[in-house]
């Protein structure tokens, strides 16, 4: 396994590149969510359709798994008396560390943040006034300490609002840097999935942006099992791979929440599992390995390291892994499993849970493109060449693909 792992760690990121002209990057969404084009890859062949036809492409008995995370208004702007503008980008909660508890805080909380124009914020606190409902409130920010390249910021505010309400009233929704534009009012709606509900992401799980409530209802009526999980998407999603080989790239940690109900349904798998987006893929695959860790007697199964999936025992079935997690739910008398993953999925990885995925078209030399390569092998070249030569739109607001995982 050490030799195989070394081979995977030595994958060169330049082998996963392609030329993406700027005009192929969708700067704005189409007028209708389901109007996007859909590339279908199955049995090694490529077909083209419209996303509105998804209701006819999926079959009764299949399980369709969505990430129900909701993008927060993570960008906060403070203007100093000197006129300098300080941007504080909220990355993840620090105190309380639990997302739900942090958003429910009524007077203060702490977050791990990135700060723009930090050189203009030498000392002291900064504040901004904002309107929520018909009243005006004040949000104050102060630096607590630096930690691993980020700043821990303590927020405090007046009026008894929850921090969720503070962000809604004071913050702006983030948009990917590669769009090269500020967020607009339309992004408030279109940069959220129609099924989003669990606050915590600073980027949307964009594969789900194409789904409408009508499509979801049609799929349910058809007998497709629609299921949900939560993974909060961090800013690390946009971080480029700067290392020459993927073994020298550090993945970001992502927080996930899984219900007992979903684990039990995965244990009783009766049809194909189709993940909506790479975040759902990483969550489902991480869940399998967490079950394997518990089977191996490891108490820290709540966390999954970047390369652990390649060093753990490889011969457990999905059912066995899910049974191990069901045992934890029973013992702990819990209905939710809260965990963290830094899993990296690269070509050579064998998918244990999913059979297919919906995903948009990703940036060159990205870990997301490696994840696609793990699913379809060298055919990723064929898929992306087809998309480029057939007028598909790329990245967050771009078109979609339905990729069947090649089974070795």
Question: Could you tell me what each predicted segment is?
Answer:
Residues 1-408:
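Surface-exposed, charge/polar-rich loops and edge strands
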């Amino acid at each position: 396994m050490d030799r195989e792992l070394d081979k995977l760690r030595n994958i060169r990121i330049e082998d996963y590149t392609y030329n993406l002209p700027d005009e192929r990057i969708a700067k704005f969404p189409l007028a209708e969510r389901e109007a996007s084009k859909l590339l279908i890859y199955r049995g090694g062949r490529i077909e083209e359709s419209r996303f509105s036809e998804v209701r006819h492409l999926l079959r009764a008995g299949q399980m369709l798994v969505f990430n129900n995370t909701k993008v927060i208004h993570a960008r906060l702007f403070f203007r100093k008396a000197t006129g300098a503008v300080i941007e504080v980008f909220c990355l993840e909660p620090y105190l309380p560390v639990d997302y739900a508890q942090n958003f429910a805080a009524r007077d203060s909380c702490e977050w791990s943040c990135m700060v723009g124009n930090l050189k203009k914020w030498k000392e002291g606190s900064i504040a901004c006034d904002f309107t929520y409902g018909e009243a005006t409130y004040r949000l104050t920010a102060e630096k607590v300490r630096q930690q691993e390249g980020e700043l821990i910021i303590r927020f405090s505010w007046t009026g008894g609002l929850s921090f969720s309400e503070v962000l809604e009233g004071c913050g702006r929704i983030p948009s990917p840097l590669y769009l090269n534009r500020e967020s607009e009012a339309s992004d408030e709606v279109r940069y959220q999935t129609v099924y989003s509900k669990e606050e915590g992401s600073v980027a949307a799980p964009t594969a789900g942006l194409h789904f409408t409530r009508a499509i979801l209802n049609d799929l349910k009526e058809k007998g497709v099992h629609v299921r949900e999980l939560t993974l909060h998407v961090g800013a690390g999603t946009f971080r480029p791979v700067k290392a020459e080989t993927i073994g020298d790239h550090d993945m970001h940690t992502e927080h996930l929440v899984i219900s007992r109900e979903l684990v039990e349904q995965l244990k009783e798998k009766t049809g194909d599992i189709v993940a909506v987006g790479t975040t759902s893929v990483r969550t489902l695959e991480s869940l399998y390995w967490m079950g394997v860790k518990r089977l191996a007697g490891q108490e820290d199964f709540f966390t999954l390291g970047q390369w652990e999936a390649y060093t753990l025992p490889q011969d457990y079935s999905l059912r066995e892994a899910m049974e191990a997690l069901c045992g934890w739910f029973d013992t702990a008398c819990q209905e939710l499993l809260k965990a963290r993953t830094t899993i990296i999925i690269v070509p050579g990885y064998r998918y244990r849970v999913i059979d297919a995925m919906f995903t948009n078209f990703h940036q060159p030399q990205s870990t997301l493109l490696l994840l696609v390569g793990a699913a379809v092998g060298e055919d990723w070249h064929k898929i992306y060449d087809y998309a480029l030569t057939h007028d598909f739109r790329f990245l967050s607001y771009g078109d979609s693909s339905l990729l069947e995982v090649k089974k070795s």
